[in-house]
Swiss-Prot record:
Tissue: Expressed by the skin glands.
Family of this protein: Belongs to the frog skin active peptide (FSAP) family. Brevinin subfamily.
The protein's role, per its UniProt record: Antimicrobial activity against Gram-negative bacterium E.coli.
Species assigned in the record: Lithobates palustris
GO cellular component: extracellular region
Keyword Secreted attached: yes
Keywords: Amphibian defense peptide, Antibiotic, Antimicrobial, Disulfide bond, Secreted
Transmembrane segments: none
SS bond list: C43-C48
Record has Ubl conjugation as a keyword: no
Lineage of source species: Eukaryota, Metazoa, Chordata, Craniata, Vertebrata
The name this protein goes by in its record: Palustrin-3b
Amino acid sequence: GIFPKIIGKGIKTGIVNGIKSLVKGVGMKVFKAGLSNIGNTGCNEDEC
């Protein structure tokens, strides 16, 4: 039937989008952590 196809497609899309957003979220966390590390090591307290 047509409905199982739509449901299956929806589930597939949901999983893919979930993984994408998860990867994006992890990527942003790593990126921000990297930036804060650069900020911390990039200047002495006197210079900040």
